[in-house]
């Protein structure tokens, strides 16, 4: 029996607009957008929401490469060179948007990301857990061409939007 396993259903319903707005200020800037945060803080959901927002803004889905490294269907990309070659072979000369979820699973991920940024017209967004991608390492690994967005778990306001509790007294 085949069963689709989704992330926690409440997490999908919360649009993290504040984070989206902050990140999208840097859309099409020559800087790698790095989304970090503790486990289960919503980094993957936020990256999916970013993809959806780009499509809403008129970016063709064909111009967005979304790579979920948690999915075994992408296990061949654990080898960073395979991922690099795959993206390069599909590049048609127009700007593409590259989104890599859980980038730390890719060998030499920093070289892959930096090479893509240098070699093709692209806008790159990556996620990773704080345990694997530390702010202090980013500037040296990616030669300083990054901006980091620290994602926190749902706020009280966001929990109230979900109907969890009815106010500060709950």
Locate predicted features.
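Phosphate-binding site recognition
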Residues: 1-170
């Amino acid at each position: 029996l085949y069963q689709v396993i989704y992330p926690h259903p409440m997490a999908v319903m919360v649009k993290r607009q504040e984070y989206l707005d902050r990140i999208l200020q840097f859309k099409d800037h020559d800087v790698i957008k790095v989304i970090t945060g503790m486990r289960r803080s919503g980094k993957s959901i936020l990256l999916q929401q970013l993809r959806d927002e780009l499509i809403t803004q008129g970016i063709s889905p064909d111009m967005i490469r979304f790579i979920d490294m948690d999915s075994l269907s992408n296990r061949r990309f654990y080898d960073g060179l395979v991922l690099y070659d795959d993206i390069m072979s599909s590049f048609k000369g127009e700007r593409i948007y590259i989104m890599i979820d859980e980038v730390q699973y890719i060998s030499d991920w920093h070289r892959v990301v930096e090479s893509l940024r240098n070699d093709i017209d692209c806008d790159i967004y990556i996620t990773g857990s704080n345990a694997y991608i530390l702010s202090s390492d980013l500037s040296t690994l990616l030669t300083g061409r990054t901006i980091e967005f620290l994602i926190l778990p749902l706020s009280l306001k966001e929990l109230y939007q979900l109907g969890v509790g009815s106010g500060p007294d709950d």
